Amino acid sequence: MRDYPKLTAEEAAQLISNGQTVAFSGFTPAGAPKAIPSAIAARSKQEQAQGRELRIGVITGASTGRSLDGALASAGAILFRTPYQNDPELRKSINEGRTNFFDMHLSMLPQAVRYGFLGPVHWAVIEACDVTPDGEITLTSSVGAAPTFCHKAEKILIELNAFHPRSLMGFHDIFEPEDPPHRKPLMLCRVSDRIGTTSIKVDPRKIGGIVATNAPDEVGGFSEISPTTQQIGDNVANFLAGEIKRGLLPGAFLPVQSGVGDTANAVLKAMGDCKEIPPFDMHTEVIQDAVIALMKAGKVRFAGGCSLTVSNPTLKDVYANIEFFRPKLVLRPQEISNSPELVRRLGIISINTAIEVDICGNVNSTHIMGRQLMSGIGGSGDFARNAFLSIFTCPSLAKGGKISPIVPQVAHLDSSEHSVQVIITDQGVADLRGKSPMQRANAIIEHCAHPDYRGLLRDYLALAGHSHSPQTLRNAYAMHLAFADSGDMRAAKFTK
């Protein structure tokens, strides 16, 4: 039994040394520490003012909140960052070359830490709603890679956040796979199965201190559903309903994985409104507002995920009705929620968002014009490659019509044509299964591209001539170059 040191955030920040690697809990802003990283950022600014440096390596489960990524990036306190981010200040620092960023599939992050591929982890900073004297840590609204961080870090600091009730105990299913060789299978055959424990057990001597906090997750709200996202959602729902009618999906449906954001929320709402789609389960990364609404409506029966990334009003609703949600929700580590083994076994319908798609079905999820990072690949690759059905969505126009997300060739490749089965935009659906590259190109141009760009893309296809893959190196990036030169892809000129 042990009494842990009670620290202020500033005292905790004093324990961190320049050049150390700090692993933070959180998967999205859900469950991410707030007080300690903000204090580290403030201390870094103080050190810089005195001619000294305090910069750290930052590892997380995924993106975090403004008090972590935002504060540290603004202070210039991040040496390197992995595996995913979504903060404007950090994105700017990465794209300006001031912060080294390593993008990776989220399912692989915990094992990369355990294998030592990312070097030693000096500190783990973990948000918890409870910690016992014998070292049992109950997490808050996400799991992410926190179990691995706790076990591999030399020392642990805990933010004990009173905003999250201790009644969260029991919502988590903590399990770490064995490392190779002879790793055993994950014994999870249904979305609702449990294979682990409800808390993280650590040696209490590793816990260097506890900082008491009371702060909500820094999850922003979602935009209202637009006509474009509504149409994308309707197209997804109608396509899936059609798959049931054709006998290509079971009548009882299959578990769903959905990305996060405005389009994902619109897709889930449309699926909930579609009478031809029966109540379904979800095995996903991020459980967001739309999932909770569908659960209350009886459309989602059970949701397993890595984080409860919902707006604060929705989170308060969940906590106020926690016994209603207890048998319907489970939070898992990201190497379980995103495990390719489980994605294939459960037969997941995977629905993710693309930045751009080319006419062969290759997807760019991460970069603008091939150069500027947006966020990272996240879990889309984990799910897309192994799903029963792999769907990518995007609008048919961007930047007021000056950009076509449907292009001859993506400027950056994240998910190749071998992992992508269906493309859906507000214009329609391109089913790529069983199609040759030329057949895929025709389907994507005719069903997914905006009418303003179909003629241009048809011209490109004609120039490709007779070949297995309809590409011409001379013109593959003509639309991107036209935007770079004139600010409008419609100005593209192809050369013979």
Q: Where do the protein language model's features map onto the residues?
A:
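Conserved alpha/beta enzyme-core scaffold
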Residues: 1-496
